[in-house]
Amino acid sequence: MQKLIAIEGIDGSGKTTLANLLKEHLESKMKLNVIVTREPFSEDIIKLIEKIGWNDPILLVLLFAADREIHVNWLSKIKDADLIILDRYYFSSIAYQGALGVDEQWIKMVNSYFPKPDMVILLDLPIEVAISRIKNDKFNFEEKIKSLAKVREKYLKLAKEYNFYVVDASKDKNEVLEQAIKIIQKNLF
């Protein structure tokens, strides 16, 4: 499989924006063939999660792992890409479902069969900034702040454990892109 970069971060951190900007930059400036994908990936699994999964964090771990298996199987068939950028990967399960109280070691074990990314970029920002970016979503404001704070804490712990590259995502999207490009050029190409 080609080089894999996972972009992680709490809701509203700018993962999708960065993934798309990186693709554009790396294809035009470095002449790389870049594929961007995101999780959840499978429409069937997404429908199942929406129907039965959100209230059961253990079921969520398993459904996201099933989705990831479909995703990774699809990725393994791509032969002409130099780089695959993943907008979320298994670290999201560890952070989000771990924040809901699911045993992190079990989540890691469930996801241990998936390819390790060559690099993980964690987009970190204060909860208030993330909330302001996703304010159009329908959610209980107080609950969302509490849950995102727990998830952010999990991500920062994972960053130390797995040597993520942490980028300040509260900055302008072009500054975030510039930081990410420097990290990629220095450490991957």
UniProtKB/Swiss-Prot annotation:
GO cellular component, one term: cytoplasm
Residues reported to bind ATP: 9-16
Reaction(s) the record says it catalyses: dTMP + ATP = dTDP + ADP
KW ATP-binding (keyword) present: yes
GO biological process, one term: dTTP biosynthetic process
Enzyme Commission no: 2.7.4.9
InterPro entries: P-loop_NTPase (IPR027417), Thymidylate_kin-like_dom (IPR039430), Thymidylate_kin_CS (IPR018095), Thymidylate_kinase (IPR018094)
GO molecular function term, any single one: dTMP kinase activity
Keywords associated with the record: ATP-binding, Kinase, Nucleotide biosynthesis, Nucleotide-binding, Transferase
Family of this protein: Belongs to the thymidylate kinase family.
PANTHER family: THYMIDYLATE KINASE, UMP-CMP KINASE 2, MITOCHONDRIAL
Protein name listed in UniProt: Probable thymidylate kinase 1
Biological source species: Saccharolobus solfataricus (strain ATCC 35092 / DSM 1617 / JCM 11322 / P2) (Sulfolobus solfataricus)
